[in-house]
């Protein structure tokens, strides 16, 4: 029996509020994270992702109280990311109610962190979060995609596809692939990026960045995504989770 494709709303949280911008800039308020999580759970979300978007740039841990309040309201798995720099941070988030923990910036600086987390908690808990972009002028990688940090503001010169492969070999049980170029644009997922990462990882792949129409979700699934993540189209009522699932089902994909 095929594994059902997951539809995942994303809560980008800053200062206790859900925010959304374009290419991680010009953030505007989108609501209360606890209320939105409750709504998406009721609307049929398969999982919910909670990203503290300013934790890494501000050098602090994710706000545990907000994670706990959100986890108490939902009955689907909750992935939490932002500001995870040590095994102890993972422990704190799991105790607060997270089911999976996303690691991004800290793992780039010290890839061994992925191995340590996987050894402590198992790879099913560990999500590698990759904010990737097409290489700008002056940057060359084999795949044409570069890993960025700090909300897409800082290039690393690291090949995004090679990094995804290394991270899964170190124990990441899932890859959350976010296109910085497409993020918030509603112009469609970066299908080529999804295909490139799909070719090198066997773990579940979550596609993020750019969803605008139900056809975009179908395109991401056809490119090899096991889950499709979106924020603004759900926050602002452009699409419902049910509409996305209906389109995926009509395209021949198994959904819950």
UniProtKB/Swiss-Prot annotation:
IGPS catalyzes the conversion of PRFAR and glutamine to IGP, AICAR and glutamate. The HisF subunit catalyzes the cyclization activity that produces IGP and AICAR from PRFAR using the ammonia provided by the HisH subunit. Keywords: Amino-acid biosynthesis, Cytoplasm, Histidine biosynthesis, Lyase. Signal peptide: none annotated. Transmembrane segments: none annotated. It is found in: Cytoplasm. Coiled coil: none annotated. Pathway: Amino-acid biosynthesis; L-histidine biosynthesis; L-histidine from 5-phospho-alpha-D-ribose 1-diphosphate: step 5/9. This is Imidazole glycerol phosphate synthase subunit HisF. It comes from Beutenbergia cavernae (strain ATCC BAA-8 / DSM 12333 / CCUG 43141 / JCM 11478 / NBRC 16432 / NCIMB 13614 / HKI 0122). Heterodimer of HisH and HisF. Its EC number is 4.3.2.10. SUPFAM superfamilies: Ribulose-phoshate binding barrel. Pfam families: His_biosynth. The gene is hisF. It is an enzyme of class 4 (lyase). One of its GO terms (biological process) is L-histidine biosynthetic process. InterPro entries: Aldolase_TIM (IPR013785), His_biosynth (IPR006062), HisF (IPR004651), IGPS_HisA/HisF (IPR050064), RibuloseP-bd_barrel (IPR011060). The keyword Nucleus does not apply. One of its GO terms (molecular function) is lyase activity. The active site is at residues 12, 131. The keyword Cytoplasm applies. One of its GO terms (cellular component) is cytoplasm. Belongs to the HisA/HisF family. It catalyses: 5-[(5-phospho-1-deoxy-D-ribulos-1-ylimino)methylamino]-1-(5-phospho-beta-D-ribosyl)imidazole-4-carboxamide + L-glutamine = D-erythro-1-(imidazol-4-yl)glycerol 3-phosphate + 5-amino-1-(5-phospho-beta-D-ribosyl)imidazole-4-carboxamide + L-glutamate + H(+).
């Amino acid at each position: 029996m095929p594994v059902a494709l997951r539809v995942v709303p994303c809560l980008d949280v800053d200062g206790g509020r859900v925010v959304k911008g374009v290419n991680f800039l010009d953030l505007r308020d989108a609501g209360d994270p606890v209320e939105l999580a409750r709504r998406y759970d009721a609307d049929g979300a398969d999982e919910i992702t909670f990203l503290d978007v300013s934790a890494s740039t501000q050098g602090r841990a994710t706000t545990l109280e907000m994670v706990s309040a959100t986890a108490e309201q939902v009955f689907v798995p909750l992935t939490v990311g932002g500001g995870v720099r040590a095994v102890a941070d993972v422990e704190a988030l799991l105790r607060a109610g997270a089911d999976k923990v996303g690691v991004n910036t800290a793992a780039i600086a010290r890839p061994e962190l992925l191995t340590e987390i996987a050894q402590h908690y198992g790879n099913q808990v560990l999500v590698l979060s990759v904010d990737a972009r097409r290489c700008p002028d002056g940057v060359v990688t084999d795949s044409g995609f570069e890993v960025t940090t700090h909300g897409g503001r800082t290039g690393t010169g690291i090949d995004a596809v090679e990094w995804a492969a290394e991270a899964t070999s170190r124990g990441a049980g899932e890859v959350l692939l976010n296109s910085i170029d497409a993020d918030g644009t509603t112009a469609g997922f970066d299908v080529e990026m999804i295909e490139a990462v799909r070719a090198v990882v066997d773990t579940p792949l979550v596609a993020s960045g750019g969803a605008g129409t139900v056809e975009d979700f179908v395109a991401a699934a056809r490119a090899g995504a096991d889950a499709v993540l979106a924020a603004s189209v759900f926050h602002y009522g452009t699409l419902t989770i049910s509409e996305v699932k209906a389109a995926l089902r009509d395209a021949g994909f198994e959904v819950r």
